[in-house]
Amino acid sequence: MKFELDTTQGRARRGRLIFDRGTVETPAFMPVGTYGTVKGMTPEEVRATGADILLGNTFHLWLRPGEEIMRKHGDLHDFMNWQRPILTDSGGFQVFSLGDIRKITEEGVHFRSPINGEKIFLDPEKSMQIQDSLGSDVVMIFDECTPYPATEDEARKSMQMSLRWAQRSRDEFDRLENPNALFGIIQGGVYEDLRDESLTGLVNIGFDGYAIGGLAVGEPKPDMHRILEHVCPQIPADKPRYLMGVGKPEDLVEGVRRGVDMFDCVMPTRNARNGHLFTSEGVIKIRNARHRDDTAPLDEKCDCYTCKNYSRAYLYHLDRCNEILGARLNTIHNLRYYQMLMEGLRGAIETGTLDAFVSDFYTGLGREVPEVPELVD
């Protein structure tokens, strides 16, 4: 992987990630394909929304279908017929989400399979081996996602163990002679000094990119912004910056303003299946009866297949009848909305018009532009 940085405006960055399987323009949003599929979508449909890269889930793909079946197909690209870049998370967040059915030790994590209750052990070495079998273009280190809330002492112990796991991930990745990219994950909760210690340790180990983890786990939005403002300028400028698990459209805008290059989130797909649709004028809840006879598209400014061909009334009808097509059309729209937002942000950074773009974005939502510190380095 090669990262090229073209231009900046304030802390916002315009660049690209270059892989053997294709180029990813940044800032980029990655749709989530947890089980090797973006729910309800063919790879061709996902690509048509403008997506250059997908996120796959190491933990779930390890449990089903497993490494053996994956290797029989070649790798995850062949298994799901997506021949463009794939980033896989390490499984750390999914283990964190298991709660009481897992036990974390220095060696790794003991847990029971959420599928059949089988006892399973996952550690940094195994995570690297699984991601190697998946053929991931970007491999994430195995870490512990610091919960929120956590005391500073709890966050410190978690972060320091994640650093030790980062070294083990690096060592196993190198032993496997994996030719792809390996990203470190910055932890430390909402504590700036711990984030500093985490980043310093990761840079000393050396990675191809750096993710900001442990956010979007329940902390107040001002805390997320504060950590981004503190951490982003300290990440080596020649490495991509990835904010994990974020988020709403406004979170992407605010992340880009603070220097983030990559995002992922289940929100556009999950919300689509629940009838919550993102538009340039805010969220439309298609289940609302006001849309029953509305012949307008979801968003006049959207060029997606759904908006070009179907009315709000039709989408309301599909939802009321619980038709699968409704969820598919909604997903196409939401994913295209997110990609159009990223395209707009990239173009605005290129032309030095980011402030105007951000102002127009919030005006469309009927909101004031949030104040941010003078974000210059």
Curated annotation (Swiss-Prot):
Q: Which cofactor does it need?
A: Zn(2+)
Q: What class of enzyme is it?
A: transferase
Report keywords, A-Z.
Glycosyltransferase, Metal-binding, Queuosine biosynthesis, Transferase, tRNA processing, Zinc
Manner of cofactor binding, per the entry note: Binds 1 zinc ion per subunit.
**Which parts of the sequence are annotated with region: RNA binding?**
245-251, 269-273
One matching Pfam family is TGT
Gene3D superfamilies, A to Z: Queuine tRNA-ribosyltransferase-like
As recorded in UniProt, its EC number(s) are: 2.4.2.29
A Gene Ontology cellular-component term: cytosol
One MF term from GO for this chain? Answer: tRNA-guanosine(34) queuine transglycosylase activity
Per the record, the GO terms for biological process are: queuosine biosynthetic process; tRNA wobble guanine modification; tRNA-guanine transglycosylation
Q: Which SUPFAM superfamilies has this protein been placed in?
A: tRNA-guanine transglycosylase
Reactions catalysed, as given in the entry: 7-aminomethyl-7-carbaguanine + guanosine(34) in tRNA = 7-aminomethyl-7-carbaguanosine(34) in tRNA + guanine
The pathway where this protein functions is:
tRNA modification; tRNA-queuosine biosynthesis
Query: Where is the catalytic site?
Result: 89, 264
> Can you tell which superkingdom this protein's organism belongs to?
Bacteria
Residues annotated as binding Zn(2+) are 302, 304, 307, 333
The residues listed in the UniProt record as binding substrate, with positions renumbered to this chain, are 89-93, 143, 187, 214
Family listed:
Belongs to the queuine tRNA-ribosyltransferase family.
- The protein's role, per its UniProt record: Catalyzes the base-exchange of a guanine (G) residue with the queuine precursor 7-aminomethyl-7-deazaguanine (PreQ1) at position 34 (anticodon wobble position) in tRNAs with GU(N) anticodons (tRNA-Asp, -Asn, -His and -Tyr). Catalysis occurs through a double-displacement mechanism. The nucleophile active site attacks the C1' of nucleotide 34 to detach the guanine base from the RNA, forming a covalent enzyme-RNA intermediate. The proton acceptor active site deprotonates the incoming PreQ1, allowing a nucleophilic attack on the C1' of the ribose to form the product.
Subunit structure as annotated in this protein's UniProt entry: Homodimer. Within each dimer, one monomer is responsible for RNA recognition and catalysis, while the other monomer binds to the replacement base PreQ1.
Identify the HAMAP family for this entry.
Answer: Q_tRNA_Tgt
What is the name of the protein in this document? Queuine tRNA-ribosyltransferase
Q: Which gene encodes it?
A: tgt
